[in-house]
Amino acid sequence: AWDPLPTGDGQKLSLRVQSNGRAYRSYSFSFTEPWLGGKKRNSLTFGINSSKYSNAFDPFTGQIDRDRSDTNYLKTTGFSVSLGKQLKWPDDFFSLVYTLNVTNYKLLNYPIFDQNFRTGTSNNVSFKIGLQRSSVFNPIFPTSGSNIMASVQLTPPYSLFNKNISSSDNKYKNPEYHKWRFNAEWFVPIGKAMGADKSRQLVLKMAAKYGFMGRYNKKLDYSPFERFQVGDAGLTNNFGLLGYDIVAHRGYPVYQSSDPTV
């Protein structure tokens, strides 16, 4: 029988377009091959993306200003390549992922971190290694198992080769940092599963998260990109454009906490 839709071997193709007019637009494309090389579970993912966030709102008129959208904006263009490998040791639940990411930021009258960095370009080039062990049953609605992940993300130490980078006009042209993350989640079923298919299960989730961001040169400030954001639910802000990792803190505004030392 003729089948016009090939099933393939689990490849994933994604195309996403978002826009709300002059203020924001985003395009992204990615492709994942989960069986690179044929028999082994080695995944290869390639992705490209482009976005523009304009400060087009005029507070005096309460309207979107076309001219402001062309003179106050943040543009990002990037691509990434990721290679994942399932490990056999210590057990089959372990996987190792390597990711190369390149993102170009272009700012025009758009302060994001430093008031002196309102206009210019920045090239964020980083390499990330992530080790994960996941034994979660039913990933969409987990009922048991655990998910533990540790990763480190590094940029080249540009200041090691250019001693004058700290005194240059654009200190963030090539941002440098090293970023560490550790996440752990446990899902513990409570009581007996109910329902005809035993899918109704009360589950206790326990989690711990740790993040650290460092710099190679103390004369340079921390990178305005790839930071950690503490507070808020992480759903309604534009920090995703800057590569921020969101540490949700429900009930508190962005960057605020009951303990000012957090």
Segments from the language model and where they lie:
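Gram-negative/organellar outer-membrane beta-barrel architecture
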Residues: 1-141, 146-148, 247, 255-260
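C-terminal outer-membrane beta-barrel translocator/porin domains of Gram-negative envelope proteins
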Residues: 1, 113-262
